[in-house]
Regions:
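A conserved mid-protein helix/loop that constitutes part of the nucleotide-sugar donor-binding site
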Residues: 50-54, 224-247, 263-266
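Short alpha-helical donor nucleotide-sugar binding micro-motif in glycosyltransferases
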Residues: 286-287, 293-298
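A charged, aromatic-enriched C-terminal amphipathic alpha-helix characteristic of glycosyltransferases
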Residues: 47, 365-386
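Glycosyltransferase donor-sugar binding loop
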Residues: 73, 195, 229, 252-269, ...
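Aromatic "clamp/platform" in nucleotide-sugar-dependent glycosyltransferases that forms part
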Residues: 306
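Membrane-proximal helix-turn-helix segments that form the acceptor-binding/catalytic region
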Residues: 147-167, 174-175, 181
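Short hydrophobic beta-strand element within catalytic cores of glycosyltransferases
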Residues: 323-327
Length: 386
């Protein structure tokens, strides 16, 4: 992974000094940066959280010292990266973010050369930005305390004249922030697509893995297996996928990243029951390491998200030969078009358009073409360079 803001000319002053071998604010070895990462919630299974941990490990391998600060540690995580929890008693998410920003500033003062945020926070040297601009939203939500709090944190990073350098993940994301804030182009760097090579296993569709995993899932030969991945049901459009099930009697939906026992799964099950398709929906919980094999077992990645800056699972599906049906709001939907590996449902979203896309994906010959196209697309080295 190439970190685009590591050039000395773009680092904050103390970090440039340390990187050149001069003195720095924490007094450690010349050439070594002491870097603080800030992320509000740290848990297994989240894409942002996985990227945070991966980047921390890369920087550690390069000899730098990294400490991850978080307000909430939801799962046991590997001990190879230092993690400090800053207790936070806020009752709402937006107040939690505000409190965490203040706590992070206090905890890192004079201790670190570089403070990197994985959420929009005040006082950051660098922001790894994984979501869209809240300032661009319209309607009644702009009147809420939540909106005002999150907008203030966004302004601290993106308003014209701010000092924070930004790592962005898609061109459309950058454009959205520039329209909202007039963010200076020289403060923003675009991170190329990046998927881990070890998550690409197109051979699993041909070497018997597909058949073994389908049998383990209880799938019959005639079952049309849809795979959905994520922890935020509404954001990822799980309800849209379930609403499509009645139109396709042989379809079965498997959800990775969310367990049936979690509160967030409740509304999804309620919708499935109301449509009498609950027997065709199964939650597999957190199964990140199994995703390549599950992609081999599946016939389709269904990802009708409402909001998705990138959508790494989209690109992972493409390179693993799994046809994709997704929405145009997803940053990585462009790879589905470029590879000719599925269907991108245009905006504004309509359920009828999703049903039409699924009808196209049901054609076995077309789906086979998409699968082969995705496997070829996955041979491009630039997909693994971010």
């Amino acid at each position: 992974m190439n970190l685009p803001l590591q050039q000395h000319g773009e680092l904050p002053r103390a970090a440039r000094s340390a990187a050149r071998g001069g003195s720095d604010r924490s007094g450690h070895a010349p050439g070594v940066l002491r870097i603080a990462f800030g992320i509000v919630s740290l848990f297994a299974g989240g894409g942002l959280q996985r990227n945070c941990l991966a980047i921390a490990r890369i920087l550690r391998r390069r000899g730098h010292e990294v400490v991850i600060f978080t307000s909430r540690l939801a799962d046991p995580l590997p001990s190879d990266v230092a993690i400090e929890v800053l207790p936070n008693r806020a009752w709402t998410n937006h107040r939690r973010n505000l409190r965490f920003a203040a706590d992070l500033a206090e905890a890192t003062e004079s201790r670190f050369d570089l403070v990197v945020g994985f959420d929009k926070l005040s006082g950051l040297d660098v922001l790894y930005c994984a979501d869209a601009s809240i300032a661009a939203r319209s309607g009644w939500r702009r009147l809420t305390p939540r909106y005002r709090a999150l907008r203030a944190l966004e302004a601290a990073c993106f308003a014209a004249g701010a000092d924070t350098r930004v790592i962005a993940l898609s061109p459309s994301q950058i454009e959205g922030y520039r329209r909202a804030w007039g963010t200076e182009p020289q403060r923003v760097a675009l991170l190329p697509p990046n998927i881990e090579r070890e998550r690409r296993h197109p051979q699993h569709r041909l070497d018997g893995t597909r058949e073994r995993r389908r049998a383990a899932l209880g799938l019959k030969a005639e079952d049309w297996c849809w795979l959905a991945i994520g922890r935020q049901p509404r954001t990822k459009g799980f309800d849209r996928a379930i609403a499509a099930l009645p139109a396709f009697p042989t379809a079965r939906l498997f959800v990775v990243g969310l367990a049936a026992s979690e509160p967030a799964a409740g509304p999804v099950f309620k919708l499935a029951r109301s449509l009498q398709v609950e027997d065709r929906v199964k939650f597999l919980g957190y199964a990140d390491e199994e995703i390549p094999a599950l992609m081999a077992a599946a016939d389709l990645l269904i990802h009708p998200a409402r909001n998705e800056t990138t959508g790494t699972v989209i690109l992972e599906a493409v390179v693993n030969g799994l046809p994709v049906v997704t929405t145009a709001v997803c940053g990585y939907a462009a790879h589905v078009r470029d590879a000719d590996a599925g269907v991108v449902v245009p905006e504004p979203f309509a359920q009828a358009r999703l049903l039409a896309a699924l009808g196209e994906a049901r054609d076995h010959r077309r789906a086979s073409e998409w699968s082969a196209n995705g496997m070829r697309y996955g041979e491009r080295p630039e997909l693994y360079s971010g």
